[in-house]
């Protein structure tokens, strides 16, 4: 068993190159990558280089060329990491590279063919095979699946895959995702089914580089909890967490555009990722997706550069969701493997060089892994406590009564339940049967438990029947009761007993079903494979690990020998003649000059890379500025200022996520109850408040109108028409003109008041005539009449 903690452990980096595709061969692209598997070196040749320019060489922990197999990568590189996870360490495997270089193939592969299965299915098989071969250990395996699409975290196993999840941080457990679903799995088939469900909702699309390109970062999380009894007699729980990461492709946006041939896009949440069946439909989404992908990968590169430099005190984990989730895997409590996937074609030179530099920086990261022993929030401990509680209830009901333990025919001692497993006679019998059988011909727990329950139920029924017979005999012997009363009491006793038995049986069956369901979730090894085959498989695994370790040591020794040869060549200072000294020093000078030129070329490439990254960032910044200006324009022209102020007052900065959010309309601490809606009044079509009822009773205009438009009377009053003839002298008289205007205004106001009274009257009120009022025309005629009479006289 590995040590519980190590001072530091370097991040393991391996490189893998795919073969040339048919499309690249047809286009005439040449191969620019050379993989030295023995030395662990990758040599990259610039197709546009000057005649004297040397190729660039990078050294990694392991290198796999185009002829390598999936099993080679897993056995030599990933298998030791999975063994560490089963011992309680955190582990991470992630693939990084350009789109179309084989990241998804490396991580998942082809599920149907065993030889082409990738890291994830091989890890499934490895975990459950180890559990089946373990002894005196109890396991609980659960799986989660998420993706990061355009900087939004989505649960691929949720019924609402488009729902956005939040990142939280706990001082004890670290970074976690709130409301992330998790499924307990019992075998390889179940965990494969969980992953297939998640793959159906993952965001993929067609680009120039790949017809089925991953447009999101996907992380499959496996949590393995193990319970084992220690030397102190107590159960100790270890929790190992495995992150299997399939990153989206890193490439420039002009190469990540939509495929003009038209490729289907299948984003999660059923279309939020854009892109229908044509390339034009996806044209608006692909640049946006590529921008978000490059931003997150750029943040990942900044984190790796800060960790590798050992000079920066601040590590920018919070720059993206991806780096927050991988915080433990990069410089924290985890063992991490990075698989750098490369494209060999000449048109991928820039991307391959960027990937190699990225991987070369990652080699310098130091992690501090430790065993996660006895954490507080383990699901396995909750399962054990729940099983113990159900077992106690069943024993209290007499369904799991104590039985003598079986002894083997060979005189062995009684076999107890496995450590950490709640003792029960069913489990005792199960384990004893397997100990008696050398061939491990086990019986499944389900029939044993069912037979035990049936037998104990029969005993319980027999006891109740005997009790009933005793009560019947007591009633029969009671001479103070008449025969009718005795018969009535006997019938009541039988009915009560039958009812109690039925209720007891239902409750017991429910408890037993829950007990069996909880028990079946826990995995105990040593049952599924024969001992002889078990030992052979263990020996094969040990031999395979020894071979992989020997290859790794051989590769390291060869690298050290090359360095020492260079050092010894420099230290040799004895020459037989001046000619020999000139030749040796000339050769050394040429070699140093070539190194100088390589360093200058590297500096120039770094400068060009810096300019390219800066241009990409400026382009992304300009795009965000355009979007921001558009939103400001919409806000200024279409949203009222008061609504804008309300929105601005609700905004606050969430320091944990570094995002602006809205405060709730109702504070969480205020227990405010909503007002009840007015109940419907008798005879009215709608609910009416008390104020409206009083207003209607007073005859005034009610606040809430309850009348039906069908009950309103039609306005059939004839229009008021005035025909007035004025002489030429009257038309010239200003008082006559004023009189005409007042009469027209009076007619208009009279019609308006009549229509208002009719429309405001409810269907339950009788028609009322408007009160007579003094009109402007009458006042005017009254004021004019004395003057007119005087003039006439």
Swiss-Prot record:
CC per GO annotation? cytoplasm; microtubule
- Domain Kinesin motor, which positions? 10-365
One biological process term from GO is: mitotic cell cycle
Compositional bias, Gly residues, is annotated for 270-284
Coiled-coil residue windows: 376-630
Looking at the record, which segments are called Disordered? 251-288, 395-423, 756-793
In its UniProt record, a GO molecular function of this protein is: microtubule motor activity
Annotated spans, Globular: 631-793
Where is there biased composition of kind Basic residues? 399-413
Q: Where in the cell is it found?
A: Cytoplasm, Cytoskeleton
Fetch the InterPro entries from UniProt.
Kinesin-like_fam, Kinesin_motor_CS, Kinesin_motor_dom, Kinesin_motor_dom_sf, P-loop_NTPase
**Signal peptide position in this chain?**
none
Subunit info? Heterodimer of KIF3A and KIF3C.
Q: Per its database record, what is this protein's job? A: Microtubule-based anterograde translocator for membranous organelles.
Query: What family does this chain come from, according to its entry?
Result: Belongs to the TRAFAC class myosin-kinesin ATPase superfamily. Kinesin family. Kinesin II subfamily.
Annotated protein name in UniProt: Kinesin-like protein KIF3C
Q: Which organism is it from?
A: Pongo abelii (Sumatran orangutan)
